[in-house]
UniProtKB/Swiss-Prot annotation:
The lineage of its organism: Bacteria, Pseudomonadati, Pseudomonadota, Gammaproteobacteria, Enterobacterales. It is found in: Cytoplasm. PANTHER family: RNA POLYMERASE SIGMA FACTOR FLIA, SIGMA FACTOR F FLAGELLAR. Keywords: Cytoplasm, DNA-binding, Sigma factor, Transcription, Transcription regulation. This is RNA polymerase sigma factor FliA. GO terms for cellular component: cytoplasm. Sigma factors are initiation factors that promote the attachment of RNA polymerase to specific initiation sites and are then released. This sigma factor controls the expression of flagella-related genes. The keyword Transcription applies. The keyword Zinc does not apply.
Amino acid sequence: MDKNSLWQRYVPLVRHEALRLQVRLPASVELDDLLQAGGIGLLNAVERYDRLQGTAFTTYAVQRIRGAMLDELRSRDWAPRSVRRNAREVASAMQKVEQRLGRPATEQEVAQNLDIDLTEYRQILLDTNNSQLFSYDEWREEHGESVEPMLEGHEDANPLQHLLEGNLRQRVIEAIEALPEREKMVLTLYYQEELNLKEIGAVLEVGESRVSQLHSQAIKRLRARLNNDS
């Protein structure tokens, strides 16, 4: 098959990968931008593919397409500073509330401390969690491995693994055990069982966005507890 035929045959793969990636990103990320980057990735795959290396073209093309899309996202620093700032503010508020009450803070209590309503609080959880989950899934797709062998320099990709490293491990395990049951289950199903958000939602009988919020809140709660203990 010549290069032009190869390109035409695999163009639909670009859209497939773009749609898969878009669902994990904020609404501000345009599908057209992903398609354009993915198209460049496919073009590179067509130009550089060597069948003598023994890799199927589909496998090689997917790697190039995803890589080009991820490069585009990294170059644009897609997670706005406001998202990072909000994440820090939520973690700080949660720490203060739990320190004062001596128990896990409810969503309403954290929202009240931040002087925002519950809807706005849950949107912050959703936005910040998209960043965390995207980073982890990006790492997992690039390396094709599970959580355990996280490479040095990728500690932000898996927030739970990062917390478990070093001398914090026992404290983190104890903090996880003290989490509200649903938050603990989300972490277990996502990081250990490697279920996606839709599958976890089916287990908990909630929507994907609610799973995302629970994950975000669990990670922030863990960090708040560790800060309280330090």
